[in-house]
């Protein structure tokens, strides 16, 4: 499968141990750095990766939450894997209620912790979860992040990272992306 000539599905070199559904951000496609590093790590750990591509600007009148849920549910319905993991970035973290209802493990990059439905769903999910966000991100609530960490979530909180997990400094942004990649790697190693 392709989107705009780009592949949307990736298979690991050996037998697959499950599938990861990747729900991107509003303006952060699956090929952007954080999601691409996550794709590589998932493949290294034996996961098939199914990217969900969307144009969030053309969703019409549909609310964001149900719109994201519909896309993730459709991608999930196409899969036969016994094990499913959800990866969401920003807008894609509106899939948290869907993941929680099914107890799916998840990696949430810059989750919308200021949205009570997202925070509650992450807190209610019995699956393993990693959250990565920054204190310079207005959509990251450090108090909520602490509560979720106390509830069992793994949390990477970067003091100077914004919603793109970056800063105005190119080298520091690369360092932050490396921190996220290491956190994802450690999370998957424990899976």
Language-model features: where?
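Gly/Ala-rich beta-loop-alpha elbow adjacent to hydrolase catalytic centers
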Residues: 86-96
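Acidic catalytic loop of the alpha/beta-hydrolase fold
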Residues: 135-140, 163-164
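Conserved alpha/beta-hydrolase "acid-adjacent" motif
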Residues: 30-31, 117, 138-144
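Serine-hydrolase catalytic machinery in alpha/beta-hydrolase-like enzymes
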Residues: 1-82
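Hydrolases whose catalytic domains are alpha/beta-hydrolase-1, hotdog thioesterase
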Residues: 94-99, 117
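A conserved short beta-strand
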Residues: 102-116
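Short beta-strand/loop motif that positions the catalytic acidic residue
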Residues: 125-126, 130-133, 137
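Catalytic histidine-centered segment of alpha/beta-hydrolase-like enzymes
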Residues: 161-176
């Amino acid at each position: 499968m392709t989107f705009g000539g780009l592949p949307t599905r990736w298979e690991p070199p050996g037998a697959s141990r499950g599938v990861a559904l990747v729900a991107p951000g509003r303006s952060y496609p699956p090929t952007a750095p954080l999601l691409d590093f996550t794709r590589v790590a998932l493949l290294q750990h034996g996961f098939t990766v199914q990217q969900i591509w969307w144009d969030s600007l053309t969703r019409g009148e549909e609310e964001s939450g149900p719109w994201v849920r519909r896309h993730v549910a459709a991608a999930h319905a196409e899969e036969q894997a016994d094990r499913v993991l959800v990866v969401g970035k920003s807008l894609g973290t509106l899939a948290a209620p869907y993941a929680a209802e099914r107890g799916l493990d998840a990696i949430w990059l810059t989750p919308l912790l200021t949205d009570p439905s997202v925070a509650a769903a992450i807190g209610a999910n019995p699956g393993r979860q990693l959250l990565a966000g920054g204190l310079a991100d207005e959509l990251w609530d450090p108090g909520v992040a602490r509560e979720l960490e106390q509830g069992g979530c793994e949390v990477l909180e970067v003091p100077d990272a914004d919603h793109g997990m970056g800063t105005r400094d190119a080298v520091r942004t690369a360092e932050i992306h490396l921190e996220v990649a290491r956190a994802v790697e450690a999370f998957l190693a424990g899976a």
